[in-house]
Every structure is written in structure tokens, then in C-alpha cells.
UniProtKB/Swiss-Prot annotation:
Start and end residues of each stretch annotated as Disordered: 116-135
Active site per the UniProt annotation: H9 (tele-phosphohistidine intermediate), E87 (proton donor/acceptor)
Entry's EC annotation: 5.4.2.11
Known role: Catalyzes the interconversion of 2-phosphoglycerate and 3-phosphoglycerate.
Taxonomic lineage: Bacteria, Pseudomonadati, Bdellovibrionota, Bdellovibrionia, Bdellovibrionales
Gene name for this UniProt entry: gpmA
Keywords in alphabetical order: Gluconeogenesis, Glycolysis, Isomerase
Family: Belongs to the phosphoglycerate mutase family. BPG-dependent PGAM subfamily.
Species of provenance: Bdellovibrio bacteriovorus (strain ATCC 15356 / DSM 50701 / NCIMB 9529 / HD100)
Claim: Isomerase is one of the keywords in the record: yes
Binding-site list for substrate: 8-15, 21-22, 60, 87-90, 98, 114-115, 183-184
Pathway annotation: Carbohydrate degradation; glycolysis; pyruvate from D-glyceraldehyde 3-phosphate: step 3/5
Subunit structure: Homodimer.
Reactions performed catalytically: (2R)-2-phosphoglycerate = (2R)-3-phosphoglycerate
Protein name per Swiss-Prot or TrEMBL: 2,3-bisphosphoglycerate-dependent phosphoglycerate mutase
């Protein structure tokens, strides 16, 4: 039996402002830092330790991982940062307030952009200085692979080669693996592990900063899944994520 722990980064400044964030490299909010520390403490109290960690190249995930590793007293742990664990690219929506966008375009359209499986939001122009092709952290990535927008289906296609080629073999080798990433890159993994349909994954909301543990069999099929935290707090956090795309 293998164990795999997933954590969505703590609340970011743009989560706090209810903005579409995507690949924009915004920092953790004060609440987000507290969430990361609390998540790490919960793991420590349950006796978790890890052999390797994976995260994205965005600071809100990297800093969350650092806080968690500090809490479990494993700041020395090997950490692999990979752009394929980035959040889904929200295209031209990045930076826009979700509630204002819902009021303008309708809640149903925003829900489709946020939660449908294969409908991407409007693309970001390549000439936009925020486009990843202008960001030095992606200078060694094939420009054809850098998105201007993504659906969840696109995010799955981007992430799965990293899972199949690197992370899954680490899990199968018996390593205790920690992944700290983003709502949609983690949903991509959840869909893959649990065999969810597009409709099923559309209804899944990942709370910020709360560790989720999978127990997996020899074929990486899910035996057990549970959040490491107070059940009422987990429920409230999931509902808060679900309500982000609604007009005020």
C-alpha cells in the first residue's frame, strides 16, 4: 500500500480578492500562510513524513510547501518544481474578479469556464506581457507547449506526462510523496486516480491548505481518501471554493 498527500496552496492574495489567478504569480495572503502552517501541523500531528516533494513554479505553491516542510521538520527534503503542476491557465480572464465576471456574463457561463471539462476561457493574447512566453521561468519550455488558455482537459493532458513519467514511479518505488500544487492541477490528478467522468470532476472543489491523503494499491488504484483536518472546517472550506464564481 502506498500513501500520497496532496495540498492545494494556501489562500493567495487574488483568492482573497476573488480574482481568476491561473499562471499569474501572486503571493499568499496572511490567511494563506496560516493555512499552510496549519496544514503542516496537521500532518505532523498525524505522524506524516515524506521522501520527496513536487510543486509548481508559482510562488503561492512553493511557499505553501516550504511552510508545510518546516512544520514537519523536513525542510531538507528533495523538492522538484515543474511548470506542469501549474494552475490551469485562465487566459484573458486572469486578473478579473469572479463575481463581477459572473454579473457581466452570467453565473452559468462563468461556471462553464471554471468547471467544465473541455471549454477553455477566452485566450490571452501572445503579445500580452503576462503571457508565459515572456516569462524567464519558462525559457527552457518548448514555446508550442506554453498555453494562452486551458480547459481542465488541457490541464490533464499537460500534467499526466509528469505523473506517468516521474511522480507515479516515485510512488511505486515506495516513496512517501507530497504534492503541493493548485486547484485544477490537483483535480486533474484526482480525476485520473479516481477514474472520474468529466461531469463528476466538474463538481469537485479543492479547499486551500488542507492536506488530502490517498492510500493506493500496487496498481495505484484508490483504496482510501481522506482530508487531514477537522471535518466541519473541511466542509466549510469546500463550500467557500464552490461559491467563488457566483454573482454577489
Amino acid at each position: 500500500m502506498y500513501k500520497l498527500v496532496l495540498i492545494r496552496h494556501g489562500e493567495s492574495v487574488w483568492n482573497q480578492e476573488n480574482r481568476f489567478t491561473g499562471w499569474q504569480d501572486v503571493d499568499l495572503s496572511e490567511k494563506g500562510r496560516a493555512e499552510a502552517l496549519k496544514g503542516g501541523k496537521a500532518l505532523r500531528e498525524k505522524g506524516f513524513s515524506f521522501d520527496v516533494a513536487y510543486t509548481s513554479v508559482l510562488k503561492r505553491a512553493i511557499k505553501t510547501l516550504n511552510f508545510v516542510l518546516d512544520e514537519v521538520d523536513q525542510v531538507w527534503l528533495p523538492v522538484h518544481k515543474d511548470w506542469r503542476l501549474n494552475e490551469r491557465h485562465y487566459g484573458a480572464l486572469q486578473g478579473l474578479n469572479k463575481a463581477e465576471t459572473a454579473a457581466r456574463h452570467g453565473e452559468e457561463q462563468v461556471k462553464i469556464w471554471r468547471r467544465s471539462y473541455d471549454t477553455p476561457p477566452p485566450p490571452m493574447e501572445v503579445s500580452d506581457p503576462r503571457h508565459p512566453s515572456h516569462d524567464p521561468r519558462y525559457k527552457n519550455v518548448d514555446a508550442q507547449l506554453l498555453p494562452s488558455n486551458e480547459s481542465l482537459k488541457d490541464t490533464v493532458a499537460r500534467f499526466l506526462p509528469l505523473w506517468d513519467g516521474t511522480i507515479a514511479p516515485a510512488v511505486k518505488s515506495g516513496k512517501n510523496v507530497l504534492i503541493v500544487a493548485h486547484g485544477n492541477s490537483l483535480r486533474a490528478l484526482m480525476q485520473h486516480l479516481e477514474g472520474m467522468t468529466p461531469d463528476e470532476i466538474m463538481g469537485v472543489n479543492m479547499p486551500t491548505g488542507i492536506p488530502m491523503m490517498y492510500e493506493l494499491d500496487a496498481n495505484l488504484k484508490v483504496l482510501k481518501k481522506e482530508f487531514i483536518g477537522d471535518p466541519d472546517e473541511v466542509k466549510a472550506a469546500i463550500e467557500a471554493v464552490a461559491n467563488q464564481g457566483k454573482a454577489k
